[in-house]
Amino acid sequence: MPKGAWSTAASGTREASTPSRSSWPASPTTSPPPWSEPDAEISRRKRSSSSWPKSPIKTTQETCRRFCARPPSTTPKLILSNSLSGSSSPGPSSSRRGARFRRSTAASSRSPATSARSTSSCPRAAPTCPCPLSRRVPSPPYLRGPARVTAFRCIIQGHPRGPPPAARYRSRAAGMRPLASHRRRHQPAPGNQVSPGPSPRPDPAMRGKPAGAPA
């Protein structure tokens, strides 16, 4: 069956199944309601304005300068992401947002935590990190590769291999510190050679009586 005949037959069956307009009750006003035309115009304008994909902005020297002077290859990507996010036009606010996003990405890629040059930096990459591997020098051969993970695990109390050498020395120095201050505190003073002994515990029978009272 040719295409035109099929559409004619379909329209004929549709007309047969639905009542004709002439059989409907006549409306008091024959003209369409006054709000239908502006609504149709507004919806048509919306459809035409929200058509996808939007035409990309021409990459010029000005647009490159507006996006932090990035190379032209990355500029259309940024414009497309701004237009897909729902903004009607890449105005000053969206371009500012894009520039801030580009700046933060560049700054994070240059940070020592993610750069490949820091061989044995701590994951936190803080100078005050208590981790022994946060020093900024290349790690010795016995701490490269899997041995570095083992050294991290050895810091845990009671690990079979014990703590790494640096942590061992640190713990020994930390243990000697209170002992040295204790010795210093109990050395005899120059004027008083005899340090007073501990006060004797009172006799239980003398409890509640004055100190000079007979037993």
From Swiss-Prot:
Listed name of the protein: Uncharacterized protein F-215
Bias type Low complexity, positions: 16-29, 49-58, 85-96, 104-127
Domain of life: Viruses
Ranges where the record places region Disordered: 1-144, 156-215
